[in-house]
Design a protein with these regions (language model features):
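Polar-ligand-bearing catalytic/cofactor-coordination segments
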Residues: 1-295, 309-313, 317-403
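N-terminal signal-anchor/signal peptide hydrophobic helix marking the start
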Residues: 295-304
Length: 403
């Protein structure tokens, strides 16, 4: 690997700079179009009265509600997935065209099918519980379903790295692929006071699908682990990867995970309540036209999903603002936890972000509106500026999080 160049600001070669700006504009439009198209898909399902057809099939199959759910839910989830395929296909073609994805269409199709299968299994469980709660408490379902969904969400977060992620990617012990990196990560984790032993540090094969770079910490409790993509190992130095992993470790040390879970739960409660307040009005106005008997009818689900999608999208800027704050804190933690372990840790961090931005074609000058609406991380230029300016030690001070 070539010696990393000294970074003073985020810059790209002219050809890649142009590509990055163009890709940013495309993603901006796609986000808006994708949201509107998702609403259009749900409206089509309501307009074509597909949900009542699936409900009738489910009710003819069995008088037992849980068996009805196992017929109705997969049919509706698969229908939504198929109708949303055009936007998914277009997004993948854009990623391939800009060189971010190298995944062939057959492999991509297989991943899509796996994703739909997971969605059908998980979605059926949630839908079954949702309508059981609605039938028992038509006026308080939004609160009781929220309570029930929290532990289920935590369980999914726990099992995702153990069961779901291996469905889509190959994993191997990191120590078998890069013993030097494993030792460096172990040193950083020890300094952070986190319990992530080498046997829970993994290499992930991403190169057959993507050119993007990534390293992350995932899971909770016994499933917590560090994952480093093979593309990252190929294009970043060990100190740069340690900084990225230090950033990710910061999310755990600074309790960002429970904080975000609590905040996300609060947002979810608001979304459910707004859905409850509006679904009755919607069904009174259009329920007969759509073939929906009432809120406890399986066929009401597309209408409820349409409302929840709108409210979630409207609240996304609030969620993103909180996320950007936590990501900035994690950047600061990554600088502090690698200070003393890595010479010139600020420059190393800037080099890491330069590499990430270059490969991922990060926009050199995103508009404030784009950042406000859609960025859940600070922009790459802002992150590099912070890394190059944050140095409390030169003034005789110490880090805020790591002393």
């Amino acid at each position: 690997m070539d010696t990393p160049q000294k970074i003073t600001a985020y810059t790209l070669p002219p050809d890649r700079d142009q590509k990055a700006r163009e890709l940013s504009r495309i993603y901006f439009r796609l986000t808006i179009i994708g949201f509107l198209y998702g609403l259009f898909v749900l409206w089509l399902i309501l307009r074509w009265r597909l949900a009542p057809k699936y409900r009738d099939w489910a009710e003819r199959s069995s008088a037992k509600r849980f068996l009805q759910a196992m017929v109705f839910s997969p049919l509706l989830i698969l229908t939504i997935g198929v109708l949303e395929l055009p936007t998914r296909i277009y997004l993948h073609s854009i990623s391939r065209g800009f060189g971010i994805s190298v995944q062939g269409w057959s492999s991509w199709s297989l991943d899509w099918a796996k994703g739909e299968l997971v969605a059908m299994i998980v979605g059926t469980i949630f839908i079954m519980i949702l309508y059981a709660v609605i039938r028992r408490s038509p006026r308080r379902w939004w609160f009781y379903f929220w309570l029930v969904s929290l532990p289920i969400g935590l369980f999914i977060f726990f099992v995702q790295p153990l069961i779901i992620d291996p469905l889509f990617h190959k994993f191997a012990p990191l120590v078998d692929k890069d013993p030097e990196l494993t030792a460096a990560l172990e040193q950083m984790v020890h300094r952070a006071g986190e319990d992530i032993p080498p046997e829970r540090m993994f290499w992930m094969g991403a190169a057959e699908k993507s050119t993007a770079l990534n390293a992350y910490v995932t899971g909770i409790g016994g499933s917590k682990r560090i994952v480093v993509w093979d593309t990252t190992i190929a294009k970043m130095t060990t100190p740069q990867i340690v900084f990225v992993a230090g950033h990710e470790t910061g999310h755990y040390v600074l309790y960002h995970i429970p904080k975000q879970l609590i905040f996300g739960a609060a947002i979810l409660l608001v979304v459910f309540y707004l859905g409850y307040r509006c679904i009755g009005w919607m069904l009174i106005r259009w329920g007969n036209k759509w073939g929906i008997r009432g809120i406890d009818d399986w066929a009401s689900l597309p209408a409820l999903l349409l409302l929840l999608t709108i409210f979630t999208f409207v609240l996304d800027p609030v969620t993103n603002a909180i996320s950007r704050h936590y990501e900035h804190q994690a950047d600061q933690y990554g600088l502090e936890v690698t200070h003393g372990l890595t010479p010139d840790s600020g420059q190393v961090a800037a080099q890491a972000f330069q590499a990430l931005g270059d490969v991922n074609l990060a926009d050199p000058e995103p508009s404030r509106l784009q950042v406000f609406l859609f960025y859940d991380h600070p922009s790459i230029p802002d992150r590099i500026r912070f890394c190059l300016s944050y140095d409390p030690w030169s003034k005789g001070g110490q880090g805020e999080f790591v002393h």
